[in-house]
């Protein structure tokens, strides 16, 4: 089995068949004999996603990642599906099988791609619908006549039989036996080309997965989708096999290798929500070999508990609304009684009754709150529980470089220091630019989370690199910054180097970078970090211990119970009811 379209998708699925060593750009992944390939309708170009399941061609053309030659993806999609799901039979020093494929399948697959692409480009179909269409037309499971795949399989079997009968005489008996065994394995696999029911299940499973992917895209917020794609399981696998440089300049479709029948049974037994969660877990890197009946039941229980939690939250909110309504009615009733009685006596009695009513409401709230069973309160970094106790254990120590801490000062002082400093990047910036940048750089509260024991649940390590004579490390987290009426999705970037005397990491770069789903891959790549980093870090001890930093009045930190996200809130010191800014850092997706 070998790969013919290496410039676009690099993945080859290898089971019992040969993989040509001459295909230098191909990448092989071992596939369990019981597993099949599932293709997710997410197309990537290097680190960046260029096609979502919900994307129509008109959306694709407007995309910032629009390829100059989209036909290469669209018009080769059927070949991509064939190579990933079926594969090629090929033998070294024997081109009969290659010629047979070119004769019977190449033109057929090309026509499938062209027709599907025309419908996609001219019509109102989404990318996932186009992928489903390609599956249906390749495998022709509902065809009343002879299927092209079956005819090709019959011709292949004849060629394999011929090859077995004409083994080279110079081969030893041991070599012949080995070759005969391999050819029989190949023949057994090719015989499945006639098994319409097998391919019908594969098409059904693909449609099920495509639908789950659409629901994921429609149901998640932009920052949640960014968190999902940031993990990039297939990208990580490609980088491990190809290296960072080659993988970042290739195109590929996200896929997984899993027991198709198990997935279909899980969908029938547990429904679409569990299927969607299974797809999420595969996108996060869950291996198909680890997805069995026991694991599916575990996922189903997690989904049920999540639903119960949601129902409890809805019930709680309804009770709170009812209490508020009763409270309002009670106050209105008390006011009516006051008017009916004499002013002096009425005031005394009315106020007394109102207070008694409020007291009863308060007691009811406390009892119901204590009875509620919810998600345990999670303490992150400098956030505090209602008891007011500080976080204990597992906290890390960081130092802060002056180029980070200076953003806490007034815009005038920041400008003055940058103008007098050595970094050309910031010299001569206008006061207005400094004010704008302060919004994105004055986020030192992030260090409360970074030095907590939960930091790895939020931050991803994008790797180390050396620049300007110093080894540096970069971490990123997905977040949302709300300021001035705007809601901006992006990443929180943290750059560190080690203090040579103490070995303590020094934070020399800290900012929120606005980016969307399409540009997130670039932002998270080590190449981007190195290219946009300062050339040389001033290491003349221009930094202080993070623990010495005093947070200004009106800045609070908390973990949002419902989502597990970490929030930094900047309130107006003069009016704490007014929120000036809010930075929410997303927890990394949960791997079950």
UniProtKB/Swiss-Prot annotation:
Task: Write down the species.
Answer: Encephalitozoon cuniculi (strain GB-M1)
Region listing for Disordered, in residue ranges = 306-404
Superkingdom, natural source? Eukaryota
Query: Which intervals carry biased composition (Basic and acidic residues)?
Result: 306-339, 353-362
- Output the Pfam families linked to this UniProt entry: DUF1609 (PF07753), DUF3654 (PF12376)
What family does the database annotate?
Belongs to the UPF0329 family.
According to UniProt, the name of this protein is: UPF0329 protein ECU01_0110/ECU01_1500/ECU08_0040
């Amino acid at each position: 089995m070998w790969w013919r379209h290496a410039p676009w998708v690099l993945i080859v699925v290898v089971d019992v068949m040969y993989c040509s060593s001459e295909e230098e750009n191909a990448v092989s992944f071992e596939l369990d004999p019981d597993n099949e390939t599932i293709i997710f309708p997410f197309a990537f170009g290097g680190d960046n996603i260029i096609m979502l399941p919900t994307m129509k061609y008109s959306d694709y053309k407007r995309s910032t990642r629009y390829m100059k030659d989209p036909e290469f993806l669209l018009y080769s999609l059927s070949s991509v599906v064939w190579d990933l799901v079926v594969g090629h039979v090929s033998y070294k020093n024997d081109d009969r099988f290659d010629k047979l494929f070119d004769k019977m399948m190449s033109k057929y697959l090309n026509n499938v791609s062209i027709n599907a692409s025309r419908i996609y480009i001219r019509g109102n179909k989404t990318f996932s619908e186009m992928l489903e269409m390609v599956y249906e037309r390749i495998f022709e499971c509902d065809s009343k006549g002879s299927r092209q795949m079956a005819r090709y399989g019959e011709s292949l079997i004849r060629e394999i039989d011929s090859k077995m009968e004409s083994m080279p005489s110079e081969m030893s008996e041991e070599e012949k036996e080995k070759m005969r065994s391999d050819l029989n394995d190949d023949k057994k696999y090719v015989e499945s080309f006639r098994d319409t029911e097998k391919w019908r299940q594969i098409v059904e499973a693909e449609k099920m997965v495509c639908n789950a992917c659409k629901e994921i895209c429609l149901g998640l917020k932009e920052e949640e989708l960014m968190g999902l794609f940031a993990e990039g399981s297939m990208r990580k696998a490609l980088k491990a096999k190809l290296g960072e440089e080659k993988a970042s300049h290739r195109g590929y479709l996200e896929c997984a290798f899993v027991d198709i029948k198990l997935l279909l049974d899980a969908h029938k037994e547990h429904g679409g929500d569990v299927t969607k969660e299974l797809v999420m877990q595969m996108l996060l890197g869950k291996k198909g070999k680890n997805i069995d009946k026991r694991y599916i039941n575990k996922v189903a229980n997690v989904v049920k508990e999540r639903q119960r939690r949601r129902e409890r939250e809805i019930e709680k909110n309804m009770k709170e609304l009812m209490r508020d309504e009763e409270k309002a009615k009670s106050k209105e009733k008390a006011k009516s009684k006051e008017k009916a009685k004499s002013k002096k006596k009425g005031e005394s009695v009315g106020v007394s009754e109102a207070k008694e009513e409020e007291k009863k409401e308060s007691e009811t709230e406390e009892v119901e709150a204590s009875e509620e069973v919810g998600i345990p309160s999670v303490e992150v970094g400098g956030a505090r529980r209602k008891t007011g106790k500080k976080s204990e254990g597992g906290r890390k120590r960081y130092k802060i470089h002056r180029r980070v801490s200076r953003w806490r000062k007034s815009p005038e002082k920041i400008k003055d220091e940058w103008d007098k400093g050595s970094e050309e990047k910031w010299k001569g910036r206008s006061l207005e630019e400094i004010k704008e940048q302060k919004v994105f750089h004055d986020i030192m509260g992030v260090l409360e989370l970074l030095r907590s024991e939960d930091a790895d649940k939020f931050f991803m390590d994008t790797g180390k690199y050396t620049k300007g004579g110093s080894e540096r490390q970069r971490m990123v987290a997905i977040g949302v910054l709300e300021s001035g009426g705007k809601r901006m999705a992006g990443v929180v970037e943290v750059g560190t180097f080690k203090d040579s005397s103490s070995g303590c990491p020094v934070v020399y770069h800290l900012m929120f970078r606005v980016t969307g789903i399409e540009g997130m891959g670039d932002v998270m790549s080590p190449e981007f970090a190195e290219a946009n980093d300062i050339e040389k870090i001033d290491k003349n001890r221009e930094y202080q211990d993070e623990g010495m930093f005093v947070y200004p009045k009106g800045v609070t930190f908390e973990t949002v119970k419902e989502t597990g996200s970490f929030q930094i809130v900047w309130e107006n010191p003069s009016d704490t009811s007014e929120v000036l800014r809010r930075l929410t850092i997303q927890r990394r997706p949960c791997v079950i």
